[in-house]
Amino acid sequence: MAAAATRPYDVLLVEDDIADAMLIQDALSERGTRNLTQVSDGIEALEYLRDPDNARPDLIVLDLNMPRMNGREFLAVVKEDAELRTIPVVVLTTSAAPDDVTGAYHHHANAYVTKPVNLEEFEAAVRSIDVFYLDIAVKPPREQGH
């Protein structure tokens, strides 16, 4: 793996498959992840993101095919939320269907990587996000009362 990001960062991993979650956790820890929180569906992810006691993640890694609220539905909600839509999202899924790829980018995704996970491709996606979102961009403060 290449050099870690210039600063540690927080990741929300939205993945229901334990083996995939462990693989991504290992890859991200090598990239400088400070805190990684894993949830198993979009509902849990939104609950985490909307809880004012939780740190706002610097990056969301999202599977599309999950129970309850899937990744497509989650992306649609995130895109409409002024606070959440600024968080970069890497979609990591088994689907290479053109509608899924186009839909993901239309609904906020910053990168799209297919499973089985090619760690080099995944790392390149995260690294491209590092350059702008983690090293250059300033995160907006969490609004009071949210």
Put a short name on every predicted segment:
Residues 7-8, 55-59, 83-88:
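His-Asp phosphorelay/catalytic-motif detector in bacterial-type signaling
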Residues 8-28, 45, 60:
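Conserved acidic segment of CheY-like receiver
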Residues 23-25, 38-59:
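Acidic, metal-coordinating helix/loop segments flanking the phosphotransfer/catalytic sites
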Residues 62-63, 93:
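Active-site residues of response regulator receiver
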Residues 66-69:
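Receiver (REC) domain active-site loop signature in two-component systems and cognate sites
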Residues 110:
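Short, glycine/charged-rich "phosphate-handling" switch motifs in NTP-dependent
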Residues 117-130, 136-142:
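C-terminal output helix
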